[in-house]
Amino acid sequence: MKLQLCLLMLVLGVMYVQGASLTEEMAEDMPLDEQDVEFPREEKRHGYSHGHGNCDWPHGYCVYIKDPCSPGMLPCHNQYNCALSTNKCCCWPSGGRR
C-alpha cells in the first residue's frame, strides 16, 4: 500500500511538472494581447482569507478531503488553502521546515 501511494505521488508530481511546462509553452505561442490579460488574485477567486497561504511546497500538498494524508504528513486544517474546496492540505509535522 505504501509503495503504491509513493508511486502515485511520483506520477502525479511528474504530471504536474509536465503540465506546468506545457502551460509555459502555450503562453509563448499566444499573441501578446492574450498574454496580458489580468486575472483576479488567487485569494479573491477562491475566497481565501488573507492570513492563509497556499498549500504547496514546502508547506504541504492538496488531496481529496476524504483521502488520508501520506505517512508522516498531518492535516493542516485551516492553516493553508487548496484551490479546490473538495481538497484539504496535508503538511509536514514541522510546518514545512524539514
From Swiss-Prot:
Subcellular location: Secreted; Nematocyst
Gene field: Ate-SCRiP
PTM (free text): Contains 4 disulfide bonds.
Chief localization: secreted
Propeptide: 20-45
Family assignment from sequence similarity: Belongs to the Cnidaria small cysteine-rich protein (SCRiP) family. delta subfamily.
Annotated signal sequence range: 1-19
Origin species: Actinia tenebrosa
Keywords: Cleavage on pair of basic residues, Disulfide bond, Nematocyst, Neurotoxin, Secreted, Signal, Toxin
Protein name, as recorded: Small cysteine-rich protein 2-like
GO cellular component annotations of the record: extracellular region; nematocyst
